[in-house]
């Protein structure tokens, strides 16, 4: 064999080994994605709640760029050579998958919502089937701070176009329900155009951000806040965002009427009467800038009414040398558990009704796994809370019922979105948009 033949033989051999190695890795990854897809379908986690990537399978070339671009991890995978949604519940709609696709084969949106009984039917201007009642923010199905701010501005601009002769002393141009990013944006736009408006919320300004644990990092995209200016960074901590909301309120004298939980909206002579727990308001238009979390979901177990039971963690540093139980397995639960486990002397336990964490971000999954391996956090999967005592909690799993010492219980079982209220008002979900007037 000549020297050139030997060189070609070695080249072909090395190329074959490299190709075979690559083929095996790709094959393993795709088999793994197929398995994850089937598991997600069986658990019901394949279906997204908000906006999600809609993949054009005719354009998709199976390059995996979208899979690698997703910052949440685990949302997308490659099955049968095409990109597909694996864990839709993890998707929050960043849209980086669409930006990364080299063939423009992905759009991020809500898709066909005709069968979605949790998404209200909205016009292009975010108006419901009830003329003058608008929805802005995640209640309409679009997550992310940027979307909320943009929609808050958009709906009030549409109200301005259709505003009649103006308000009277007993009637507002618009009442804005919810003081999160969407509500604050709507209020700033109303102030910018000298509308007579009222901004109300059942808690303080901040919306869903108030529920986040201390120093939680929130991803967003650059967006312009009416009157205030641009949010230019891609990441903010909870505290940074709340400082911005506080600065906005002070700078523009934006008053939020707190402790006003909306109970009903009724039509009154082409106006709307809003009833809260403590007040009534009359308005020509209404902006519902409510979050999807709504009222915290309860376990309905004995002892849940004790003062040591809470549904949100504001500052982990205030809890030290305590026996703490976290109930739930989503990102909020995991982040709270990790924050508390980092405090001196805490003994942190998680009780989760499923067999493993299925909804959390990849970064959280890696961090919590490490802390469990290091025995900084104890987890009881496939378990439920039976009873909450003064100094202990009774837990039941498939094998036994047992008690653990306990000082505090944090329940992160999700929230009950305000869908019954919206049905009561007359807002339609699914089907075709029809006017009731």
Predicted segments — roles?
Residues 67-69, 113-134, 214, 437:
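FAD-binding beta-loop-beta segment adjacent to the flavin cofactor pocket
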Residues 89-108, 124-139:
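Short Fe-S-cluster ligation motifs
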Residues 74, 105-119, 279, 286-313, ...:
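Glycine-rich beta-alpha-beta "Rossmann" dinucleotide-binding loop(s) and their flanking helix/strand
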Residues 39-62, 75-93, 113-124, 139-140, ...:
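Ferredoxin-like iron-sulfur electron-transfer modules
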Residues 1-59, 63-68, 78:
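Non-ligating segments of multi-cofactor redox enzymes
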Residues 125-202, 312-357, 420-424, 434:
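Rossmann-like dinucleotide/flavin-binding elements
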């Amino acid at each position: 064999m000549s020297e050139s033949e030997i060189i070609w033989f070695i080249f072909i051999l090395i190329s074959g080994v490299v190709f075979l190695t690559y083929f095996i890795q790709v094959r393993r990854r795709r088999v793994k994605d197929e398995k994850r897809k089937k598991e997600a379908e069986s658990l019901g986690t394949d279906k997204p709640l908000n906006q999600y990537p809609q993949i054009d399978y005719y354009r998709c070339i199976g390059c995996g760029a979208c899979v690698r671009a997703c910052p949440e991890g685990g949302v997308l995978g490659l099955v049968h050579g095409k990109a597909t949604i694996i864990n839709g519940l993890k998707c929050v709609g960043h849209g980086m998958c669409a930006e990364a696709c080299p063939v423009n084969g992905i759009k991020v949106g809500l898709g066909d919502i005709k069968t979605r009984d949790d998404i209200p039917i909205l016009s292009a201007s975010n108006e419901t089937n009830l003329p003058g009642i608008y929805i802005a923010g995640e209640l309409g199905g679009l997550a992310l701070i940027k979307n909320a701010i943009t929609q808050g501005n958009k709906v009030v601009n549409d109200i301005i176009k259709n505003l009649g002769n103006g308000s009277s002393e007993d009637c507002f141009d618009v009442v804005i329900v919810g003081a999160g990013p969407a509500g604050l944006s709507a209020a700033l736009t109303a102030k910018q155009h000298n509308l007579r408006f009222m901004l109300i919320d059942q808690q303080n300004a901040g919306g869903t951000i108030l529920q986040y644990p201390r120093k939680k990092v929130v991803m967003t995209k650059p967006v312009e806040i009416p009157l205030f200016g641009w949010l230019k960074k891609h990441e903010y901590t909870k505290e940074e965002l709340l400082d911005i909301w506080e600065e906005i309120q002070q700078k523009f004298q934006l008053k939020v009427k707190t402790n006003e939980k909306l109970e009903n909206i009724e039509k009154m002579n082409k106006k709307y009467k809003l009833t809260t727990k403590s007040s009534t308001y009359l308005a020509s238009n209404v902006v519902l800038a409510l979050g999807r979390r709504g009222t915290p979901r309860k376990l309905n177990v004995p002892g849940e009414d004790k003062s040591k039971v809470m549904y949100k963690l504001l500052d982990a540093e205030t809890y030290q040398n305590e026996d703490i139980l976290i109930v739930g397995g989503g990102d909020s639960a995991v982040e709270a558990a990790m924050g508390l486990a980092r405090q001196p002397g805490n003994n942190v336990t998680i009780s989760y009704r499923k067999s493993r964490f299925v909804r959390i971000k990849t970064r959280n999954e890696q961090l919590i796994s490490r802390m469990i391996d290091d025995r900084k956090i104890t987890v009881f999967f496939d378990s439920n809370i039976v009873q909450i005592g003064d100094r202990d909690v009774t837990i039941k799993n498939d094998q036994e019922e047992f008690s653990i010492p306990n000082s505090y219980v944090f329940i992160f079982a999700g929230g009950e979105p305000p869908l019954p209220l919206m049905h009561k008002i007359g807002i339609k979900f699914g089907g075709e948009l029809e006017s009731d007037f």
